[in-house]
Amino acid sequence: MSVLRHAAAHVLVDDVATPVLTDDQAHHVFRVLRVRDGEVVTVTDGRGRWCACRASGTDIEPIDAPTLVEPRRRPLTVGFAIPKQDRPEWIVQKLTEIGIDRIVLLHAERSVVRWTADRATKHVAKLLRVAAEALQQSRGVWLPAIEGPLTAADFLPSAAAAEPGARPISADDTSIAIGPEGGWTADELEWAAGTVSVGSTVLRVETATIVSASRIVMHAE
């Protein structure tokens, strides 16, 4: 895996066996990053497969057979109530860097931000692009699934809800839900598979999301 970390660039492509860079990717690799002939560039399909390539002109050529990184036996999921402005993008970026497998956007009972179907389609498409960029920056090989918005009623039965005063996150926790800044309602806490604490202080949605993600990844590794 040291090749991934030390390559001159890491690019998300459709097929790692016959990688083709888009015009934007080629510009970034050869103009922005200034990758030179002979330098190693790694590629991934975002589904666990990656390959080392050699830069040649404005193309890249595989120099090894593709490698498959097996998925986790128990995928890690983080759901969060959609916060205001561009904070969902920042959250998705960080969750991708941390290595979360599934990201779920939530509409909770006390949510201030609610996306219509049309708006959700546009936002999720943008978040997928953010995740792709974060995967390349962090040298990851598994692109997270991004789903939603789901209602809290649909998601919470399969997740532990973050709630002050609850038990600490443990290795048994693989799915965490972060509520809105107004907190979960009593009904939502009843729907949840359990409750966990992400700290003793009052955290913003984005902070609580990253803290919980870091902890479940730490327990999984």
Name each region found by the language model.
Residues 1-68:
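N-terminal positively charged helical leader segments and presequences
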Residues 36, 50, 71-75, 98, ...:
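Short connector loops at helix/strand junctions that flank enzyme active sites
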Residues 157-200:
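Active-site/ligand-binding-proximal alpha/beta "capping" segment
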